[in-house]
Swiss-Prot record:
Subcellular location: Cytoplasm; Secreted; Cell surface
Protein name, as recorded: Enolase
Principal subcellular localisation of the protein: cytoplasm
Residues bound to Mg(2+): D247, E288, D315
Entry EC number(s): 4.2.1.11
Enzyme class, UniProt record, top EC level: lyase
Listed PANTHER family: ENOLASE (PTHR11902:SF1)
Gene: eno
Residues that bind (2R)-2-phosphoglycerate: Q168, K340, R369, S370, K391
Keyword vocabulary terms for this entry: Cytoplasm, Glycolysis, Lyase, Magnesium, Metal-binding, Secreted
Active site per database record: E210 (proton donor), K340 (proton acceptor)
């Protein structure tokens, strides 16, 4: 039997590092008395929901334009560390709720969600190291064997790119693959074909924050047409083999009760009609943030209209928060929740939200942020929770590919036990 004293937290360190956009973020290191160590880095978003946990920045314009995180680093070292040293890293719930209590706010604004999450994840990794288990197995147990279907963001728009495309993400989804390895290959081949299609049209092939191409296009629908052409050019069947998904990020272009896209303002009813028409015209299996984060009535209408035929994901709507998700469940708003660790700020609360979703028939989509690091926790989390879906960007930029490569390693480790999510009814099943 494990000697619990060997999992006692002995020291916590933290530092300011850079994310994939060159902005500071927090890295934390948790060391146990046994010598086991966990290291974690936290991401940062560009398009953020109003109800997210607070990311603490320094505000000192003389350093990183005010985006430094030295305050959060200090909080981890001077306020969180004394609270956790001596506690059992194997008791994740106690570790996380001790930090929540020490912070004392509703949104982690005192210590900073970036400080709290970094320590939360580092503690979990230290505990996994103590037991000599991979993180996915430590978190998920023996049933952690489902590899997620990737929703690959190959055309970037909105807040993720400096172009004229309103919608934030246009994704390909290899639903017909037989394994994660095959799904990744299909995605990479479509991505290469997309590059050639864009080049043939004289469009730029520079990439946005998440590694997708960021061309200036005539309309949002043109992006969908180009993706369908690219899937065919790669030798795959649109819909049955490689489907499409969208992150509308509608809160970004909503004001005064209207949605403004393609240069024209539309009422919520008109926008719902537009989304319905797109689902009928294109092989779309998932739409994220199709409406504003507080437009609950429209969300209910949209879900009743097309929720039986397409996955409707709440990101800004739910912000990985079980209270917001419970509201959505009661209002029948959406049928899936995007899971971003830094929206809520601890591993425990993230797992609680996933559990609530599962118990109420909502799908969970594990997600990165636009400002990422080399940390691959979300890959392990997707497998641990049997979520069946992951969003971690395009097929380029090493901070994105790191997560895909981690999933390849997990699939290899699992061997014959590995199952690709669509094969067991997980992922967007439409």
């Amino acid at each position: 039997m494990l000697d619990k004293s060997e999992a006692i937290i002995e020291a916590i360190d933290a530092r300011e590092i850079l994310d994939s956009r060159g902005r500071p973020t927090v890295e934390a290191e948790v060391r146990l008395e046994s010598g086991a160590v966990g290291l974690a880095q936290v991401p940062s978003g560009a398009s953020t929901g109003s109800f997210e946990a607070h990311e603490l920045r320094d505000g000192d314009k003389a350093r990183y334009g005010g985006n430094g995180v030295l305050k959060a680093v200090r909080n981890a070292k001077e306020k969180i560390a004394p609270e956790l040293i001596g506690k059992d890293a194997l008791d994740q719930t106690t570790v996380d709720y001790a930090m929540i209590a020490r912070d004392g706010s509703d949104n982690k604004s005192n210590l900073g969600a970036n400080a709290i999450l970094a320590v939360s994840l580092a503690a979990a990794k230290a505990a996994a190291a103590e037991l000599a288990l991979p993180l996915y197995r430590y978190l998920g147990g023996p049933l952690a064997n489902v590899l997620p279907v990737p929703l690959m963001n190959v055309i970037n728009g909105g807040a993720h790119a400096a172009n004229n495309v309103d919608f934030q993400e246009f994704m390909i989804v290899p639903v017909g693959a037989s394994s994660f390895k095959e799904a990744l290959r299909w995605g990479a081949e479509v991505f290469t074909a997309l590059s050639k299609v864009l080049d043939s049209k004289g469009l730029l092939t520079g990439v946005g924050d998440e590694g997708g191409f960021a061309p200036n296009l005539g309309s949002n629908e043109e992006a969908l047409e180009i993706l369908v052409d690219s899937i065919k050019a790669a030798g795959y069947e649109p819909g049955t083999q490689v489907a499409l998904a969208l992150d509308i990020a509608a809160s970004e272009f909503y004001a005064d009760g209207q949605y403004t896209y393609d240069g024209t303002a539309h009422s919520p009813a008109e926008f719902i009609d537009y989304l319905t028409a797109m689902v009928e015209k294109y092989p779309i299996v998932s739409i994220e943030d199709g409406l504003h984060e507080d437009d609950w009535d429209s969300w209910t209408i949209l879900t009743a209209r097309i929720g039986h035929r397409v996955q409707l994901v709440g990101d800004d709507l739910f912000v990985t928060n079980k209270v917001r998700l419970q509201q959505g469940i009661e209002k029948k708003a959406g049928n899936a929740v995007l899971i971003k660790l830094n929206q809520i700020g601890t591993l425990t609360e993230t797992l609680e939200t996933i559990d609530l979703a599962t118990r109420n028939g909502y799908q969970s989509v594990i997600s990165h942020r636009s400002g990422e690091t080399e940390d691959t926790t979300i890959a392990d989390l997707a497998v641990a929770t049997r979520a069946g879906q992951i969003k971690t960007g395009s097929l380029c930029r090493s901070e994105r590919v790191a997560k895909y490569n981690r999933l390849l390693r997990i699939e290899d480790e699992l061997g014959d036990r590995a199952v690709y999510a669509p094969k067991v009814g997980l992922g967007p099943q439409f």
